[in-house]
């Protein structure tokens, strides 16, 4: 797999979370109208939408084409009290801790046949319930660390004195039910908190699940308006998706799916938007390796230097890195072949300090 990016899908029971997950993976997780139907966290692997890998495969005709992938983890329905072990709380909070980001599915549709665990439809309330549970779970781990660090600070331990204010500050906001990610934490402060693996430090993408009729103009839906305003207050990203449409699309052949979406006035599935938004939110980019054996997309964080990117392929390449030969996707597509690109002098030789750009095609020279 080209990436280990992992996104946890959370949401209250019966908001459309399992329906969305089914569409993502075509895995058919049991989406019954019952609060705790998703007992084990399902993991699904989905291709990152990027036409460039297939364009490159068209030039090289490789034996194998490997796009980038994202892992989605469907985490069972959280409810009020989950942080205290109610519903299916504790084991699921530990699953969320293992993810890079959280996709929080929020119900923005009316349907009297699908019960809501809290009674009526109120997306802002639902967002608050889940955020409160995640804050409470983090509060417990921060408090333990804070108490322990305070004792060490009192005993005159210099390092403890230096980091105690960080734990105090995070503890304060979590007590108020505010996620830690809303704090403007410096790199060194984040490094101190890293070992706690706080859930509320993870970036959140609100997936606003709308009715099929609303997907053309989701912002006209008052539920979407309320949820989007709340997301913006939290400096969080949001994306409107109709889980029902996504499930229908996932069951169609490619041609039929395009026609179905076109009838709805859409050019692509909402899932593509979801994945792209998650990529942008996490600052991720793709670079490529090409050849007759394989054309492959690799995912790294924006700002990654060439040796580190090479390490994605194999640790030996990072260890013995000599240089990278780089050409951009656009240049190679224009030239039509490596030979033509070489003739035009478009292949650049870059050293250890080179920062990989989105769409770079890289050939790494190394010696171990």
Provide a role label for each language-model segment.
Residues 44-49, 76-86, 97-158, 173-186, ...:
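Conserved Switch II/interswitch segment of TRAFAC-class P-loop GTPases
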Residues 1-112, 143-144:
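Conserved G1/Walker A P-loop phosphate-binding module
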Residues 39, 115, 250:
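Short Asp/Glu-rich motifs
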Residues 36, 50-53, 66-72, 86-100, ...:
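Amphipathic alpha-helical transducer elements in NTP-driven molecular machines
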């Amino acid at each position: 797999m080209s990436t280990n990016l992992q996104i946890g899908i959370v949401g209250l029971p019966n908001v459309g979370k399992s329906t969305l997950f089914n569409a993502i993976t075509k895995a058919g997780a049991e989406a019954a109208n019952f609060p705790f139907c998703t007992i084990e966290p399902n993991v699904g692997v989905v291709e990152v939408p990027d036409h460039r890998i297939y364009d490159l495969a068209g030039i090289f005709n490789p034996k194998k084409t490997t796009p980038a992938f994202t892992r989605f983890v469907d985490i069972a329905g959280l409810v009020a009290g989950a942080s205290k072990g109610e519903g299916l709380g504790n084991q699921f909070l530990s699953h969320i801790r293992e993810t890079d980001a959280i996709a929080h599915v929020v119900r923005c549709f009316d349907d009297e046949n699908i019960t809501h665990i809290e009674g009526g439809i109120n997306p802002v309330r639902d967002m608050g319930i889940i955020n409160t549970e995640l804050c409470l779970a983090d509060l417990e781990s921060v408090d333990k660390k804070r108490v322990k660090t305070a004792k060490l600070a009192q005993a005159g331990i210099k390092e403890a004195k230096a980091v105690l204010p960080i734990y105090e500050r995070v503890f304060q906001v979590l007590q108020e039910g505010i996620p830690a990610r809303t704090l403007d934490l410096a790199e060194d402060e984040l490094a101190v908190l890293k070992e706690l693996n706080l859930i509320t430090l993870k970036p959140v993408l609100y997936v606003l699940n709308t009715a099929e009729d609303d997907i053309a103009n989701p912002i006209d839906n008052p539920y979407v308006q309320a949820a989007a305003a709340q997301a913006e207050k939290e400096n969080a990203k949001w994306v409107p998706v109709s889980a029902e449409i996504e499930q229908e699309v996932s069951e169609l052949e490619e041609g039929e799916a395009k026609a179905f979406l076109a009838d709805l006035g859409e050019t692509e599935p909402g899932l593509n938007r979801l994945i792209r938004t998650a990529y942008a939110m996490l600052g991720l980019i793709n670079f490529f390796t090409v050849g007759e054996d394989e054309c492959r997309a690799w995912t790294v964080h924006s700002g990654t230097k060439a040796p580190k990117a090479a390490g994605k392929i194999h640790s030996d390449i990072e260890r013995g890195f000599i240089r990278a030969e780089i050409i951009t996707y656009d240049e190679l597509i224009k030239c039509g072949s490596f030979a033509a690109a070489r003739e035009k002098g478009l292949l650049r030789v870059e050293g250890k300090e080179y920062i990989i750009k989105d769409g770079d095609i890289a050939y790494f020279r190394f010696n171990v």
